[in-house]
UniProtKB/Swiss-Prot annotation:
A single GO BP: ornithine biosynthetic process
Binding site for substrate: 163, 189, 200, 286, 408, 413
Annotated compartments: Cytoplasm
Chief location: cytoplasm
Annotated family: Belongs to the ArgJ family.
Record pathway: Amino-acid biosynthesis; L-arginine biosynthesis; L-ornithine and N-acetyl-L-glutamate from L-glutamate and N(2)-acetyl-L-ornithine (cyclic): step 1/1; Amino-acid biosynthesis; L-arginine biosynthesis; N(2)-acetyl-L-ornithine from L-glutamate: step 1/4
InterPro entries: Arg_biosynth_ArgJ (IPR002813), ArgJ-like_dom_sf (IPR016117), ArgJ_beta_C (IPR042195)
Site feature Involved in the stabilization of negative charge on the oxyanion by the formation of the oxyanion hole, where: 127-128
Organism superkingdom: Bacteria
Encoding gene (name): argJ
GO cellular component, one term: cytoplasm
Protein name: Arginine biosynthesis bifunctional protein ArgJ
Length: 413
């Protein structure tokens, strides 16, 4: 499919229509059905034609899954270099002990043999049901088709990484660095068990920019803190979360670093990709009908702004009210109050879909019908001004519907 670019006056980069993980130069991606799921693609891969700088951030859940342990060790041994990644859905390879680690390493070996690259340049990821061993005969079948052009489509990769997701989530943008076109692409999955500190989510980002691994890791960590770590669907943190980025240096320009004159342009584009993917996860929360954005400003510290935003968007009472299209602002101020952060009710101001509901800690009369009309929209915004400082943050989440229970009551069946 031919990619088309659309440029917004707001950005110094272009959004590529139908852009994807394989849009940057030198990257290919694919996916196929190997039998882990009943009738959907469940095995995917990304390959770079040249060795790439790489970085990753992982779940903070102490029950870290085998693929994450192996990938983290691999990146340490390779000093931040990768050339391929393979991922399966339907099986998390988590809580599987030494056999799980051995299976992840065996997968690395099979992929490396097919691509004729060192196994230490292969990352592995899994998502799905916890506590079951990988069916390695099926995994091997998948690795044997990695070089098969019939399966080498980015759309297939996007589908292969899904679990309870209702849609694929991907994007690519382009920008100019030293007069040359650089592209950043991304693909993610995530729908349930989503909570700040990474969620049941896998996110993969590729770029043909020239940037070293240490710089890439610093950028990824910074971006993750205010994007992927600021989303929540249900308050659960998965054992398998990972965000991984590869930069294969295919575009020859001055190495990107904080000293590069166009560093901020690259950072803005990278953050845009991460924000887009994070919001796509929140929007696709299991059973969700609405995306909730909580903008907190006037906090004494960034940590307070982030914590209050996440507390509001994590509240089941707030989420239920938004689903019911009920302007129950009392649930919002209650969440602010129990967040554990420093607040002053007399300085607190709250808006729901740009309609004031609380001013200096006091309820504000509003037009119930006008408010009800705005709450039928797919995007709901809560603005909180604390009046205590200059720190601000935004958290993303979704409403809580009847379908969330239906989906999760039968996840293994």
């Amino acid at each position: 499919m031919k990619h088309q670019e659309t440029t917004s006056q707001q950005y110094n980069f272009s959004i590529i229509k139908h852009g994807d993980i394989s849009t940057p130069q030198g990257f290919t991606a694919g996916g196929m059905h190997i039998g882990l799921r009943a009738n959907k693609k469940d095995f995917g891969w990304i390959y770079s034609s040249s060795l790439a700088s790489a970085a990753a951030v992982y779940t903070l859940n102490q029950f870290k899954a085998a693929p994450l342990i192996v990938t983290e060790d691999t990146l340490q041994k390779s000093k931040g270099k990768l050339q391929a990644l393979v991922v399966n859905s339907a099986n998390a390879n988590s809580c599987t002990g030494q056999q799980g680690i051995d299976d992840a390493r065996q997968t690395q070996t099979w992929v490396a043999q097919q691509l004729q690259i060192p196994s230490e340049h292969v990352a592995v990821a899994s998502t799905g049901v916890i506590g079951e061993y990988l069916p390695m005969d099926k995994i091997k079948t998948g690795t044997e088709h990695i070089k098969d052009a019939n399966f080498a489509t980015p759309g297939a990769f996007n589908e292969a990484i899904l679990t309870t997701d209702t849609c694929t989530k991907h994007i690519a943008v382009s920008l100019k660095i030293d007069g040359k076109t650089v592209t950043i692409g991304g693909s993610t999955k995530g729908s349930g068990m989503i909570h700040p500190n990474m969620a049941t989510m896998l996110a993969f980002i590729t770029t043909d920019a020239s940037i070293e691994s240490n710089t890439l890791h610093q950028l990824l960590k910074s971006s993750t803190d205010h994007t992927f770590n600021m989303i929540t669907v249900d308050g659960d943190t998965s054992t398998n979360d990972m965000v991984l980025v590869m930069a294969n240096h295919q575009v020859e320009h001055q190495i990107l670093s904080q000293d590069h004159p166009q560093w901020e342009t690259f950072v803005d584009a990278f953050n845009f990709v991460c924000t887009f993917l994070a919001k796509a996860i929140a929007r696709d929360g299991e059973g969700a009908t609405k995306l909730i954005s909580v903008n907190v400003s006037g906090a004494k510290s960034i940590s307070d702004a982030r914590k209050i935003g996440k507390t509001i968007v994590s509240s089941n009472l707030v989420k239920s009210a938004i689903f019911g299209e009920d302007a129950n602002f009392g649930r919002i101020i209650t969440a602010i109050g129990y967040s554990g952060c420093e607040i002053d009710p007399n300085c607190t101001y709250v808006q729901l879909n740009q309609i004031p509901v609380v001013d200096k800690g006091m309820a504000v009369l509003f037009d119930e019908q006008a408010m009800s009309n705005t709450l039928t929209h797919e995007n709901v915004t809560i603005d909180v001004q604390l009046g205590l400082g200059n720190a601000a943050a935004t958290a993303y989440g979704c409403d809580l519907s009847y379908d969330y229970v239906r989906i999760n009551a039968s996840y293994r069946t």
